[in-house]
Amino acid sequence: MYFYVINNNLVKENKKHWERIYETKNIDGVSWFQKKPFTSLSLIEISNVNKDAEIIDVGCGKSFLIDNLLEKKYSKVSLLDISNNALKEVKSRTKNFPNSGVFYNSDILDFNPDASFDLWHDRAVFHFLTKSDEINKYVKICEKQINKNGYLIIGTFSENGPLKCSGLEIKKYSVENLKEVFSNSFKLVDHLNIDHVTPFD
């Protein structure tokens, strides 16, 4: 398996937190909003997965990544988010696109579907896992759910990033740290350092 790295400069409580965020904020009122997520789209295209590859966007929120992928004729785009509110909005927004992907309303650490994936995209979840047991469980889930020769595209805050995001503590990574976390089953193909510009900048 391979992975790309994008480096940016309690279950019930987590669910309540994210439901509140997506109930009270406009879609463009969060710092991670991107109408067209160019970096993610580029990395997915570079992976050269087929248009019918099983793709999942982990911690999708109300992201427009799925809209852009469906416009590009990817046909099996699944979403995972702890917020049912966010998933409902995205489902409504993309209902006119042909898509055989599944919308999973789950905490990532409880995620255990029958499906497996050719490409796993996460620019929103992993850095919120701050405890060793959570991180190890996430890695095990990736190892189980990503197909052999599949791709893991993961974005985290770099060592120069903030201490918190959306009011929650996060864990920051260097490329070497991230490489080590996933080293048992994944091989680093490439990494990027991105200065994320928020909608408020």
Ranges and model annotations:
Residues 124-128:
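Short catalytic micro-motifs in class I SAM-dependent methyltransferases
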Residues 144-147:
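Short, conserved loop/helix-junction motifs that constitute active-site signature segments
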Residues 118:
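Conserved acidic residues
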Residues 1-115, 129-141, 151-201:
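Class I (Rossmann-like) S-adenosyl-L-methionine-dependent methyltransferase catalytic domain
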